[in-house]
A protein has these predicted regions:
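N-terminal intrinsically disordered, cationic/polar leader segments
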Residues: 8-96, 101-152
Length: 152
């Protein structure tokens, strides 16, 4: 089953103080929903944490010496045991950098840089916003090819 086969559209959230509590439902894609939320709410700087369940997830490993991501898609029932990441800005738009850990039906762990993740049950995500902005820029030393924090 590919990530594009089933879409949900019922993400709900509540703003409590300066933070957000987000519920994702079956079929919703984590990166799309969180990016949309950040755009709509003007979230420029935040930390992300969450848990949930997925039936299709794409994570990757970045090979620093090759300056290349190696993505891998996983399908089947998975518990998302941890989503951890940040929201910053790149070119004036939200830039989400999230890592995910999950386990499959045999409780074998997978994890890496999150590219896509479709929710199969529910997703429970917290965004802790911070005042100000942090941008992104390519590694100034050219050693990694990564988009690193830019403190302007």
């Amino acid at each position: 089953m590919s990530l594009s086969e089933e879409k949900g559209d019922s993400m709900e959230f509540r703003k409590i103080g300066e933070d957000y509590v987000v519920r994702l439902d079956r079929g919703e894609e984590v990166m799309e929903c969180l990016t949309s939320l950040c755009e709509k709410e003007g979230i420029a700087l935040a930390s992300i944490s969450g848990i949930g369940a997925s039936d299709c997830m794409e994570v990757g490993l970045y090979n620093v010496s090759e300056k290349k991501y190696y993505p891998k898609e996983f399908t089947g029932e998975m518990e998302i045991t941890s989503l951890v990441g940040s929201v910053t800005e790149k070119d004036g738009k939200p830039y989400l950098h999230i890592h995910a850990n999950a386990c499959d039906e045999e409780l074998k762990g997978i994890g890496g840089h999150l590219k896509k993740c479709r929710i199969s049950g529910t997703g429970e995500i917290f965004l802790h916003t911070l005042p100000g902005k942090v941008g992104r820029q390519e590694d100034l030393k050219g050693q990694t090819g990564l988009n690193v924090f830019s403190f302007e």
